[in-house]
Amino acid sequence: MAKGGQSAASSAAEAELAAATSTSASTPAPGRPRATQQRLEIEGYRVEGISIAGHETCVIFPSLNLVFDIGRCPPFAVSQDFLFVSHAHMDHIGGLPMYVATRGRKRMRPPTVFVPACLADLVRRLFDVHRAMDQSDLDHKLVPLEVEEEYQLTKDLRVRAFRTYHVVPSQGYVIYKVKQKLKDQYAGLPGKELSNLRKSGVEITNVESTPEIAFSGDTMSDFILDPDNADVLKAKILVVESTFIDDSKSIEDAREKGHIHLLRVCLTSLKTKLFY
């Protein structure tokens, strides 16, 4: 079972998702990989996505209104208000202009797009070029995040970027659920008295943050052993891309390309007790 409160059913569902995203019920067009949108229920969250190495990665959590990487902008991702880009390889970021343009055409609110801070200027230039070609606003809010930097998404949700290890600048994201909990010394007081304390400037609650979702994007397994990434392993759901799953490619082959081999995940998990 996965560490951090994840159930055996959740682990089984993860295996199902990994298998499902590599198959399709229909015959693909010549020269294109087979892919269908997959839906699962894990730890109380509905998860939808497409992931084919080198072609497209996009994973959404509809109840949280967020999408990790945008792939080729599959239609199911357009409705999500928050987009988190892990790195700039085309199979992860290629659909970004279309995502923003489609939301604008549908008169949806401008999305908030999070990118590694080192990519922010390049992304701005990308949109400048597309605005010139498309003659449209392509309105969105771009938020550059450094590793370890945090951002409050909503009253109840917060994101933190964490370090990953790919062949280009990259990072993952942890989504935290934020709750206000009444301090023990004020428990049992009448509501009116609590209200008066608030009005007088007294802080009567503590903020509690729980890691709910973590997404790695493309990376080597080193991120699992990074001591700064402890919350990543505590998340209820950790989405990890394992590009190589059999002996047709070695662990060394995977590392050379900045990816994870499934065998390495298993070995690392045994060392860290990520799964037990």
Model feature map: region roles:
Residues 52, 57-59, 81-89, 209-215, ...:
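Acidic/glycine-enriched edge-of-secondary-structure segments
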Residues 71-115:
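Active-site metal-binding motif and surrounding structural segment of the metallo-beta-lactamase
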Residues 98-101, 125, 267:
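Short, well-ordered alpha-helices that flank and scaffold nucleotide-derived cofactor binding pockets
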Residues 107-111, 119-144:
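Active-site neighborhood of divalent metal-dependent phosphoester bond hydrolases
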Residues 111-117, 272-276:
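Divalent metal-dependent hydrolysis catalytic cores, especially in the metallo-beta-lactamase
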